[in-house]
């Protein structure tokens, strides 16, 4: 085995994405895992699962298991089981929808309850999505930052539509969980806008209206 192979390490992290159904959670997870953006809104029922492997400084390979939890699961019997064992929690809201921000209190209360019963204390990140719609913002940045300071969250603003800061968000969360500091060059390289491709799930318009796509499970090949 070569020195480079010996130095290479592999880790796996469970990242759970929570928030209201229209906050853009699935678009965020899809943008990170596949660098695509689905124009059609599809409600996540229960749970969707995404995978992506990234490399952090120190030749550390990390596979992120991204659990996209359906917005309607709040108060459901399975939510605590989905959250249990997570190393990272992303609380996602739509910056143009104040209610989606207010409802994060309910999501976070579940996280706190589960954390009290778990040996794993997750890193919690507050993610303001849809910054491409800054002109329609209803949640002021100082509200976002105050919520972070009061609860010890890390702070992120992203656009799942343009890809702005999406990879950087997941990269910084993974690095913070593992105690790794990113330098300025690494942050600037990750803070890029990816081209948002429209995902066409069905080539036949008539069939699409009658039989909408039922599966949204995906992983990076």
Curated annotation (Swiss-Prot):
Q: Where in the cell is it found?
A: Cell membrane; Cytoplasm, Cytoskeleton, Cilium basal body; Cytoplasm; Nucleus
According to the UniProt record, one GO cellular component term is: cytoplasm
Q: Which PROSITE patterns match?
A: RAB (PS51419)
Q: Give the domain of life.
A: Eukaryota
Write the record's keywords in alphabetical order, separated by commas. Acetylation, Cell membrane, Cell projection, Cytoplasm, Cytoskeleton, GTP-binding, Hydrolase, Lipoprotein, Magnesium, Membrane, Metal-binding, Methylation, Nucleotide-binding, Nucleus, Phosphoprotein, Prenylation
Q: How does inactivating the gene affect the organism?
A: Knockout mice are viable and fertile. Cone cells have elongated outer segments (OS) and enlarged OS tips. Knockout mice exhibit reduced cone and rod electroretinography responses and progressive retina degeneration. Cone phagosomes are almost absent, whereas rod phagosomes display normal levels.
Subunit info?
Interacts (prenylated form) with PDE6D; the interaction promotes RAB28 delivery to the photoreceptor outer segments. Interacts with KCNJ13; the interaction may facilitate cone outer segments phagocytosis. Also participates in nuclear factor kappa-B p65/RELA nuclear transport in endothelial cells.
Write the protein's name.
Ras-related protein Rab-28
Query: What is the protein's species of origin?
Result: Mus musculus
């Amino acid at each position: 085995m070569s020195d480079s192979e010996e130095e290479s390490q592999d880790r796996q992290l469970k990242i759970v994405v929570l928030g209201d159904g229209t906050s853009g959670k699935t678009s965020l997870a899809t943008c990170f895992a596949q660098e695509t953006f689905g124009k059609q809104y599809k409600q996540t029922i229960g749970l969707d699962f995404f995978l992506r492997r990234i490399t952090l400084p120190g030749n550390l390979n990390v596979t992120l298991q991204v659990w996209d939890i359906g917005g309607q699961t709040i108060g459901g019997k399975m939510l605590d089981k989905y959250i249990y064992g997570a190393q990272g929690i992303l609380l996602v809201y739509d910056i143009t929808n104040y209610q989606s921000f207010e409802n994060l209190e309910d999501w976070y209360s579940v996280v706190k309850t589960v954390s009290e019963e778990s040996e794993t204390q997750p890193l919690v990140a507050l993610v303001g999505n849809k910054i491409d719609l800054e002109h329609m913002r209803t949640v002021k940045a100082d509200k976002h930052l105050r919520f972070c300071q009061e609860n010890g969250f890390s702070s992120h603003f992203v656009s799942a539509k343009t890809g702005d800061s999406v990879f950087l968000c997941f990269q910084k969360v993974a690095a913070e969980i593992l105690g790794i500091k990113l330098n300025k060059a690494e942050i600037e390289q990750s803070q890029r806008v990816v081209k948002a491709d429209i995902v066409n799930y069905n080539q036949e318009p008539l069939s699409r209206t009658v039989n909408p796509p039922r599966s949204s499970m995906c992983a990076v090949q």
